[in-house]
């Protein structure tokens, strides 16, 4: 799946729908400087390499859910593991699923 590029006169953003909308490049066009760490050219765009991106979507929750379980409304809720390299459920599901772009313009997707 190709990378998605968005830009305006000041900023350039490159997103990988394949890696859960991970940001592979985000830079200031006028200063020609990276704002986020760019995705390494030596790495392949895969689910397991999203950690190398400058940012990935942590939705619908952020951080670690210890032993994949939390307590809510007087009951325990068990979640499935979100990433094969992680021992606990972590960062929601948005970053480990392919995203489908429904609409794109030069500056939005």
Residue ranges and their predicted role:
Residues 1-109:
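Surface-exposed acidic/polar loop and edge beta-strand patches at domain peripheries
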């Amino acid at each position: 799946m190709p990378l998605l590029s968005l830009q305006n006169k000041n900023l350039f953003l490159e997103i990988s729908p394949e890696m859960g909308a991970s940001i592979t490049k985000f830079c200031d066009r006028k200063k020609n400087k990276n704002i986020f760490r760019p995705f390494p050219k030596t790495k392949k765009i895969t689910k397991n390499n999203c950690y190398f991106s400058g940012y990935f979507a942590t939705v619908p929750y952020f951080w670690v859910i210890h032993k994949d379980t939390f307590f809510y409304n007087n009951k325990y809720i068990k979640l499935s593991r979100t990433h094969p390299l992680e021992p606990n459920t972590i960062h929601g599901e948005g970053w480990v699923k392919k995203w489908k772009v429904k609409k794109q313009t030069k500056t939005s997707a």
